[in-house]
Swiss-Prot record:
Keyword annotations: Cell inner membrane, Cell membrane, Membrane, Transmembrane, Transmembrane helix
Pathway in which the depicted protein is active: Bacterial outer membrane biogenesis; enterobacterial common antigen biosynthesis
Subunit structure: Probably part of a complex composed of WzxE, WzyE and WzzE.
Function, in words: Probably involved in the polymerization of enterobacterial common antigen (ECA) trisaccharide repeat units.
Name used for this protein in its record: Probable ECA polymerase
Family: Belongs to the WzyE family.
Species: Escherichia coli (strain UTI89 / UPEC)
Length: 450
């Protein structure tokens, strides 16, 4: 890449970054937080944060990258995607009418809410316990990270339930919403994330998500300023780099350490070059249609229920890894959101996907605002826990693609909804058995007097 070509790419990158950052800043000033702000920051991180890192790798370490015209296509496709997404998100689908009283879809009380977070936490802890009994601490047993996907590891499906510890702790926080509950959320979820990091053998998702939710709650409540958020972001990048070194068993120093930091940070936070690789091989792609979305559900179907279930699921990430890159190392390489759309339907699917994503984020913000307006604090805690708990799925959306997001968000909704239903059923059984006694002001006053 020549300096002239780099200069042209830099101008496009700068314009796209300023465009998205400016719209995000105005939205932040207006509402301080919503899921449009979160997705916009996530989109910036995924598709634009990596460009400076790639530039240093090219000019400092002479690393090979896709041709400049392909990198330009990747930057422009990301910028156009966001423009269509933003217009869709801001388009009002129906006229605003005065809020009329409606019959609520569901209600929550204190006992049901506490039962819900206990069940969610129980699912996570029991899953971790069973996985540990089968495999021990994989971080200290396996020689390479790719081995966690091999047949040596049993009970892999249990990992999908680990994440429900975070929504459980979110319910606990939203019931109190003070600084102590906020700090307790951080300590408990990060400790759990470190535990799963050691047990699973290097998976950092729970730590990243817990830390991100902690920061956004701090921003919403005014406990964290923007400069503190920036400092925490730098600390998070360094922390994720250190965990990556431990995961891959690397011991580096000097220029090698700087080089390793650049490419691991780029691959962890901003795999935008994967989109460029996909566009470089555009003519070799056999468009998959909506099949990757259907196939991604296969991993949630137990083999005893479907004996003939394919052992290898050809979703967009695996198609990109196996068919496009001819990589059979055992690790799936993230195609990114835009890349998954290209795999499914080519360039035509990029604006269509942007419209779909705009509607998805609009729905989450509607649910979040519903929680903000809710007068029943127990129901509000459940709604907010669901919304913030889905942050993991939004990260999957930006990094892995639309197909992975759809299957995971459906799984999340089913499990979360099942926990709600079980909590309500248990409450009904306890109440029928006479074990539930409603609190009254007089009884509470008597306890205080005594």
């Amino acid at each position: 890449m020549s300096l002239l070509q780099f200069s042209g790419l830099f101008v496009v990158w700068l314009l796209c970054t300023l465009f998205i950052a400016t719209l995000t800043w105005f939205e932040f000033r207006r509402v301080r937080f919503n899921f449009n702000v979160f997705f916009s920051l996530l989109f910036l991180l995924t598709f634009f944060f990596g460009f400076p890192l790639t530039s240093v790798l090219v000019f400092r370490f002479d690393v090979g990258v896709a041709p400049p015209e392909i990198l330009l296509q990747a930057l422009l496709s990301a910028g156009c995607f966001y423009a269509v997404y933003y217009v869709t998100y801001k388009t009002r689908l129906r006229k605003r009418v005065a809020d009329a009283p409606r019959r609520p879809l569901f209600t929550m009380n204190r006992v049901e809410t506490n039962l819900t977070w206990v069940i969610l936490m129980g699912i996570a802890l029991v899953s971790v316990g069973i996985f540990f009994m089968h495999n021990g601490f994989l971080l200290f047993r396996l020689n390479s990270y790719s081995q966690i996907f091999s047949s040596e590891v049993s009970g892999v499906a249990l990992k999908r339930f680990f994440y429900f510890f975070i929504p459980a702790m979110l319910v606990v926080y939203f019931l109190r919403q003070d600084s102590k509950a906020w700090l307790f959320f951080l300590v408990s979820t990060v400790a759990f994330g470190l535990l799963t990091y050691m047990i699973v053998g290097g998976t950092r998702a729970n730590i990243i998500i817990a830390f991100a939710i902690f920061l956004f709650i701090g921003i919403i409540r005014g406990w964290i300023s923007l400069w503190m958020l920036a400092a925490a972001g730098v600390l998070g990048i360094v922390g994720m780099f250190w965990l990556a070194l431990k995961r891959y068993g690397m011991n580096v120093s000097g220029d090698e350490a700087f080089y390793t930091f650049l490419y691991l940070t780029r691959d962890t936070f901003s795999p935008w070059e994967n989109l460029a690789l996909l566009l470089q091989n555009y003519d070799n792609i056999d468009f998959q249609g909506l099949a990757p979305i259907v196939r991604d559900f296969y991993v949630f179907i137990p083999s005893w229920l479907w004996p003939g279930r394919p052992s290898m699921v050809l979703n967009s990430a695996n198609y990109f890894t196996w068919e496009v890159l001819n990589n059979h190392s055992g690790l799936a390489i993230s195609p990114t959101l835009i890349g998954s759309l290209v795999v499914m339907g080519g360039a035509l699917f990029i604006p269509l996907g942007a419209i779909v994503v705009g509607l998805i984020i609009k729905w989450f913000d509607w649910l979040y605002e519903l929680g903000n307006r809710e007068t029943n604090r127990y129901k509000a805690a459940i709604l907010h826990s669901f919304c913030f708990g889905a942050i993991f799925n939004m990260i999957v959306l930006a990094r892995e693609g639309l197909d992975s997001f759809v299957s995971r968000v459906v799984f999340f909704i089913v499990v979360f909804g099942a926990c709600l239903m079980i909590a309500k059923l248990l409450y009904w059984l306890f109440e029928s058995a006479g074990l539930i006694h409603k609190r009254t002001k007089s009884s509470l006053w008597t306890q205080v007097e005594g």
